[in-house]
Regions:
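Active-site substrate-binding loop specific to GH73 endo-beta-N-acetylglucosaminidase modules
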Residues: 2, 66-68, 80-87, 119-353
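Cell-wall polysaccharide-cleaving catalytic domain and substrate-binding groove, primarily
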Residues: 2-56, 147-151, 159-160, 172-175, ...
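Flexible, low-complexity segments enriched for small/polar residues
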Residues: 3-27, 260, 264-299, 308-516
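Short, compositionally biased low-complexity segments
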Residues: 13-22, 56-59, 75-78, 164-168, ...
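N-terminal accessory alpha/beta regions
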Residues: 15, 27-133, 206-207, 218, ...
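Residues that form generic nucleotide/phosphate-binding pockets
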Residues: 19, 34-35, 43-50, 91, ...
Length: 516
């Protein structure tokens, strides 16, 4: 049976949780149970459904969108934060959808940072491009990102003119965005830069309400022929003149790159590391990467069929791969909120609550070394580009901060607006088949919380030393029955709630909770 063959067996609870952990920022128990029993083919159709186009981010003071307003230096920091909070809110509220996980993949692939671009309206506009193309055609995606105003700013494409070519984008287009190191030469970088001369952005930090868009200036374009190396079979892109020269030559450049078999392999490897595992062995390369790269090439570089094949494959559902990825700060922090059904308020009727909650989440992400829309380099976040180093998310500092985040949730000390960010352990216990039975309670919680199985000694410790703190196990049964016989009694509710809360806090601190 080939690794890429479709897995057609209805999903178990653990398999459904595995799919949802990898394809979203984390499932709720209800979503796990909803997907259990479905075939992967049915499940992926739900995940691939196109969500409604989100409303743009708003200024927290006026609650009005700012993407079409004139630039305002005094509000730039506020708008930058509002754009980040807007996207975090979409991640939290996304439901069982692949979209936001794919948008993050592409934002970390086609890196343009808010700090460098320094115009929140540009970064928001780019995010709309990322989500529009997230599961579309890769060729069209590369072409549009090449001309994207934020990208032109970030990699200096707007400074690339005839006679004074800027090679930044021509290099990253090949090294990071399409084909990878070792598959082009320095002369190819120079030739690509000449192809790309003449593009510039309009509307940057404009104090009038002009459109943010891209313009091709024919007079700044290199009209001579561009000769590429043997890596590209000595292709010549003929120099053009006139208003269509930029688009024509850009299309030929992208076609030349994508005609190389390595381009499809390069992208499938990145998708593999994002969704499955960082370790690509020779066997995986031959039996998984190469077949899916052929699907990508033969499908004219359509993204959706490749992602579908990957997420429904026999290999994806290999039990050995569950828990093989360390959660990013987003997967940990947002995933925990999503698991407990905590949603982001609407920023328009409740700007204070929305801003306070998103600021809290963003601060936790940043201190755990993931600043959304602001990667440290053009390579993206190191755990994704430094092959095999997902564990870079965790060190002695960030591990303590991860634990602090979940401790704050169980303590219920974080407020946003008029609400408190708190988990409800009693409600979570009631979702198990028999919360009065400590064995069933811990077993079912563990199955929902963790990507890998706990040992029996771990389960026993959670029951005997954490939940009931050294008492006989029947004591928990009695305490739960006492509570349910008088559920409005605050003292009885507090008694079980405190024990469940302590158990949650301990489970969050287990190494297994850091894995997905």
């Amino acid at each position: 049976m080939a690794l890429t063959d479709p897995y057609r067996t209805p999903l178990t609870l653990q398999q459904a949780a595995h799919l949802l952990r990898r394809a979203t920022f984390g499932p709720s128990p209800a979503q796990i149970k909803q997907f259990a029993g479905q075939t992967p083919q049915a499940a992926i159709q739900t995940l691939l459904a196109t969500p409604a186009t989100p409303a743009p981010p708003v200024d927290p003071t006026t609650t009005k969108p700012f993407d079409t307003l004139a630039f305002d230096t005094t509000l730039q920091g506020t708008w930058q934060n509002a754009t980040k909070y807007w996207w975090l809110g979409l991640m939290i509220n996304a439901g069982a959808s692949l979209r936001e996980k794919m948008v993050l993949f592409w934002q970390n692939h086609f890196v343009s940072t808010a700090a460098v671009v320094a115009d929140a309206r540009y970064i928001y506009r780019q995010n709309t491009v990322l989500r529009r193309h997230a599961l579309g055609n890769f060729r069209s995606f590369v072409i549009e990102m090449t001309k994207d105003p934020a990208m032109l700013r970030y990699l200096n494409g707007n400074q690339n003119v005839v006679g004074k070519p800027n090679e930044n984008y021509g290099r990253e287009l090949q090294e990071l965005f399409t084909i990878g190191v070792g598959n082009y030469t320095e002369d190819d970088v120079k030739a690509a830069a000449r192809v790309l001369t003449g593009w510039t952005d309009t509307g940057y930090r404009s104090t009038t309400t002009v459109d943010i868009t891209t313009t091709f200036k024919a007079a700044q374009h290199d009209t001579t022929d561009k000769v590429f190396s043997a890596a590209y079979k000595n292709t010549v892109i003929k120099g053009r003149t006139g208003s269509t020269a930029g688009d024509t030559e850009l299309g030929e450049l992208v076609d030349m790159i994508l005609a190389q078999p390595e381009a499809a392999r390069f992208m499938v490897r990145k998708l593999y590391r994002w969704f499955i595992n960082a370790d690509i062995t020779a066997a995986i390369e031959a039996n998984f990467i190469e077949p899916l790269a052929q699907v990508f090439r033969q499908g004219n570089y359509e993204i959706k069929p490749v992602v579908t094949a990957l997420l429904t494959s026999q290999h994806f559902f290999d039990d050995a791969l569950r828990g093989s990825i360390v959660k990013s700060p987003l997967e940990l922090n947002i995933g925990t909120l999503r698991f407990f059904g905590i949603t982001a308020p609407d920023a328009v009727p409740n700007p204070t609550g929305f801003t306070q909650l998103m600021a809290f989440v963003q601060a936790r992400n940043v201190e755990q070394q993931l600043n959304i829309m602001d990667q440290p380099t053009v390579f993206g976040w190191r755990p994704y580009y430094d092959t095999g180093f997902y564990d870079l998310w965790i060190n002695s500092t960030t591990l303590a901060l991860r634990g602090s985040f979940t401790d704050q949730l169980t303590a219920g000390t974080v407020k946003f607006g008029t609400e408190k960010l708190a988990l409800d352990p009693v409600a979570m216990a009631k979702q198990t088949t028999d919360p009065s039975d400590p064995v069933k309670l811990i077993n079912e919680w563990a199955a929902l919380f963790f990507a890998t199985d706990l040992t029996q000694s771990q389960r026993d410790f959670l029951i005997d030393e954490v939940l009931i703190d050294g008492l006989p196990r029947y004591e928990w049964n009695l305490e739960w029955q006492t509570y349910t016989s008088d559920p409005t009694n605050k003292n009885k509710l507090m008694a079980v709630s405190m024990k469940l809360n302590t158990t949650l806090q301990y489970m969050f601190r287990l190494a297994e909770y850091q894995l997905c």
